[in-house]
From Swiss-Prot:
GO biological process: L-arginine biosynthetic process
EC number: 1.2.1.38
Recorded family membership: Belongs to the NAGSA dehydrogenase family. Type 1 subfamily.
Catalytic activity as recorded in UniProt: N-acetyl-L-glutamate 5-semialdehyde + phosphate + NADP(+) = N-acetyl-L-glutamyl 5-phosphate + NADPH + H(+)
Source species of the chain: Xylella fastidiosa (strain Temecula1 / ATCC 700964)
Listed HAMAP family: ArgC_type1
Gene Ontology terms, MF aspect: N-acetyl-gamma-glutamyl-phosphate reductase activity; NAD binding; NADP+ binding
Keywords attached to this entry: Amino-acid biosynthesis, Arginine biosynthesis, Cytoplasm, NADP, Oxidoreductase
Name of this protein: N-acetyl-gamma-glutamyl-phosphate reductase
Broad class of the protein's primary localization: cytoplasm
Function text: Catalyzes the NADPH-dependent reduction of N-acetyl-5-glutamyl phosphate to yield N-acetyl-L-glutamate 5-semialdehyde.
Superkingdom, natural source: Bacteria
Compartments (UniProt record): Cytoplasm
Pfam families: Semialdhyde_dh, Semialdhyde_dhC_1
Gene name of this polypeptide: argC
Length: 327
């Protein structure tokens, strides 16, 4: 007999984020995974694709009505953008008490959905059952900018580089390893979805220039911030350390963080704090794993809080190593 308190299903579990979710949820003491939906893997054992899972579940092909009929306590939608609405409508009609966590961008601009970036928005959570998980780049940008948001003299300029897992599993130039070899691929250099997302959440215009690199996972985000008045490096670093003092998944470090030290970790590193002459411009670097804190880990934080559990339940975090100085 299971001792789990809550039942949970995942829709869209074939992708990289779905796999990360299964790994985390398998170790969750209060969650029973009752269905995992994937058309491509239909009928195949979940354990054959995820060695951390030891149960008997098989992937299923479930339409929105079938998902709603499962009446799970929690449904996580890990679908490509543009696909969430039919599932939300079916659950709203059949099982409205179900907690829905949407990992796509479909609900991030909907005021009826709680925007779940816990380190910045947990104080606004009041029991909502519809939670929108932030984007991976958007998470890094907001955490890098937020402590200085009210002291900025102009739009933050953010240069982002992600591993190709951020492009998902559907073949495209952005996850074509042959095209990415020895390459850095710029794309959507203005009006990127995450640029609009961050601008909406922070209430200021943000300029974002994304790129894809040959590595598999991990984001490095360099934020160029102009200040209204001169500030010292020590003041700014203290501002960040104070802002995130009670957030165990945020590491404030002295040097610029390295993306190769964030892979497979649940935390965010924020560092560099490099001042331009005159102390009215600072450059800050943030790194995170796009599949974890940029997706699955953040979903688990939101799930835990919504279920009344400790926010970090089943998140095996540890401080990241600090990069060694370049000789």
């Amino acid at each position: 007999m299971s001792t789990a308190t809550f039942t949970l299903g995942i829709v869209g579990a074939r992708g990289y984020t779905g796999a990360a979710l299964i790994t985390l949820l398998t170790a969750h003491p209060a969650i029973e995974l009752i269905f995992v939906s994937s058309r491509e893997y239909h009928g195949q054992p979940v354990a054959a694709h995820n060695p951390t899972y030891c149960g008997d579940l098989r992937f299923e092909t479930l339409d929105p009505a079938a998902v709603a009929a499962k009446r799970a306590d929690v449904v996580i939608l890990a679908l490509p953008n543009g696909n969430a609405a039919p599932y939300v409508h079916a659950i709203d009609a059949t099982a409205p008490p179900t907690l829905i966590i949407d990992l796509s961008a479909d609900t991030r601009f909907d005021p009826d959905w709680y925007y779940g970036l816990p380190e910045l928005t947990r104080h606004t959570y009041t029991g909502q059952k519809r939670i929108s998980n932030p984007g991976c780049y958007a998470t890094a940008m907001q955490l890098a900018i937020a402590p200085l948001r009210d002291q900025l003299a102009g739009p933050p300029q953010c240069f982002g580089v992600s591993g190709y897992s951020g492009a998902g599993t559907t073949p495209s130039d952005k996850n074509n390893q042959a095209l990415l070899r020895d390459n850095l691929m710029p794309y959507a250099l203005t009006d990127h979805l995450h640029e609009r997302e961050v601008s909406a959440q922070l209430g200021i215009p943000v300029e974002f220039m994304p790129h894809v690199a040959p590595h598999f996972r991990g984001i490095t985000l360099t934020a160029n911030l102009w200040l209204q008045r001169p500030l010292t490096r020590e003041h700014i670093k203290t501002l960040y350390a104070t802002r995130y003092a009670n957030d165990p998944l945020i590491d404030i470090i002295d040097p610029p963080p390295w993306v190769n030290q964030i892979a497979a970790r649940h935390t965010v590193q924020i560092g560099a704090f490099t001042m331009a002459p005159g102390n009215k411009r600072v450059v800050i670097v943030a790194t995170l794993d796009n599949l974890l804190k940029g997706a699955a880990t953040q979903a688990l934080q939101n799930l835990n809080r919504a279920l009344g559990l400790d926010e970090l339940t089943a998140i095996p975090y540890q401080p990241n190593p600090v990069p060694s100085p370049i000789p």
